[in-house]
UniProtKB/Swiss-Prot annotation:
Pathway per the UniProt entry: Nucleoside biosynthesis; alpha-ribazole biosynthesis; alpha-ribazole from 5,6-dimethylbenzimidazole: step 1/2
EC code(s) of this entry: 2.4.2.21
Pfam families: DBI_PRT (PF02277)
Family stated for the protein in its record: Belongs to the CobT family.
Gene name in the database record: cobT
Enzyme class, first EC level, given as a word: transferase
Chain's role: Catalyzes the synthesis of alpha-ribazole-5'-phosphate from nicotinate mononucleotide (NAMN) and 5,6-dimethylbenzimidazole (DMB).
InterPro entries per record: Nict_dMeBzImd_PRibTrfase (IPR003200), Nict_dMeBzImd_PRibTrfase_bact (IPR017846), Nict_dMeBzImd_PRibTrfase_N (IPR023195), Nict_dMeBzImd_PRibTrfase_sf (IPR036087)
Keywords tagged on the record: Cobalamin biosynthesis, Glycosyltransferase, Transferase
One Gene Ontology biological process: cobalamin biosynthetic process
The protein, known as: Nicotinate-nucleotide--dimethylbenzimidazole phosphoribosyltransferase
Gene Ontology MF terms in the entry: nicotinate-nucleotide-dimethylbenzimidazole phosphoribosyltransferase activity
């Protein structure tokens, strides 16, 4: 990212009628948004625009779920996607409240949505980009092929591109997939210097006994990732929804479009994207710090300062949807707050 306007933008923020830094993280959000929207321009922007914020929820099933790493069976992935399309989930409530466009992407559930609700086959909020009927059990074998990784990156890029072409200049990603905290934990362990027990958490609310087993299963997958590159690790232990989110992050960067990053699984996808293209980090804002064990560690890897810490552990993109009003507030003060000079305030 071209940061040549950073000092000019910071001066504009500092000259608002407030003590220096008094708006905390909102000032950093305003700086980053203004920098992003100043790319390829001859001068820094005086107004931050937020147009058609769009939530993309990526859904997929995981073979590792057969090992009992979640309190819920894999069938719940499809059931929750049906709930999303019916408008009954938490993410629907928050998107409706904050006027966020909503789409759910079937990246590879065990079965397509119409096998459960035939009328949802052509639902306007459903995008089908299936890579298969769920991944393989990564505790025992490779989760997906390298060809599926490549196709998943392409599919995710196309989903993000379409949202941007439809008028969005701020994306949010969420996820749904029973077993996906195991996949995200394995990826984070394999691609960072972190220990497996730092990256694995309670997910949907498993017992201590289940957690101990989950750590062992994740370690089995991670052990196959030694000496592999990022895409190789994605193939070994990744998820269909995770790889498509990685592709979507990469595409958002190509379009110079910021992404408001949700919780643990989305943050791991963000981290993976930075390993493939470090400049994707310049186009990320971080919504919240969740209760999931590994989230604080991946945020540290990304040198991220999340806006909220509400004890959330739901996923779906809920943290990002809840943080959007703060992002809008950052734009609002940047656009409309008086300067010392215009207000006639002397300090």
């Amino acid at each position: 990212m071209d940061r040549s306007f950073a000092s000019e933008i910071q001066a504009r923020i500092d000259n608002k009628t407030k003590p220096l830094g008094a708006l905390g993280l909102l000032e950093k959000v305003a700086l980053e948004l203004a920098l992003i929207q100043s790319q390829d321009k001859l001068q820094s922007v005086e107004t931050i625009e937020i147009r058609k914020p769009t939530m993309l929820v990526f859904a997929g099933d995981h073979g590792i779920a057969k090992e009992g790493v979640s309190i819920a069976p894999s069938a719940v992935t499809q059931q929750m996607v049906a709930n999303f399309l019916a408008g009954g989930a938490a993410i629907n409530c928050f998107c409706d409240l904050n006027q966020i466009d909503f789409k759910v992407v079937d990246c590879g559930m065990l079965s397509p949505i119409d096998t459960l609700v035939p009328d949802f086959k052509h639902h306007p909020n459903l995008i089908e980009r299936r890579l298969g009927n769920g991944t393989a059990n990564f505790a025992k074998q490779t989760a997906m092929s390298l060809e599926q990784v490549a196709l998943g990156l392409e599919y995710g890029a196309k989903v993000a591109q379409q949202a941007i072409l439809n008028g969005s200049n701020l994306l949010m990603f969420g996820e749904m997939g029973i077993g996906n905290t195991s996949s995200a934990s394995a990826l984070l362990t394999a691609l960072s210097l972190l220990e497996v027990d730092h990256c694995v958490g309670y997910g949907t609310g498993i017992t201590q006994e289940q957690l101990n087993r989950k750590i062992k299963l994740v370690a089995q997958g991670v052990n196959r990732c030694h000496d592999l590159d990022t895409k190789g690790a994605l193939a070994q232990v990744g998820g269909f929804e995770i790889v498509q989110m990685v592709g979507a992050f990469l595409e958002a960067k190509r379009h110079k479009t910021p992404v408001l990053v949700d919780g643990f699984i989305v943050s791991v996808a963000a981290y993976v994207a930075t390993l493939l293209d470090e400049e994707t980090r310049d186009y990320m804002l971080f919504a919240h710090n969740s209760e999931e064990n590994g989230h604080k560690f991946v945020l540290e890897c990304l040198q991220a300062e999340p806006l909220l810490d509400l004890g959330l552990r739901l996923g779906e993109g809920t943290g990002a949807a809840l943080a959007l009003p703060l992002v809008k507030a950052a734009a609002q003060f940047y656009n409309n707050m008086a300067s010392f000079e215009s207000a006639g305030v002397t300090v």
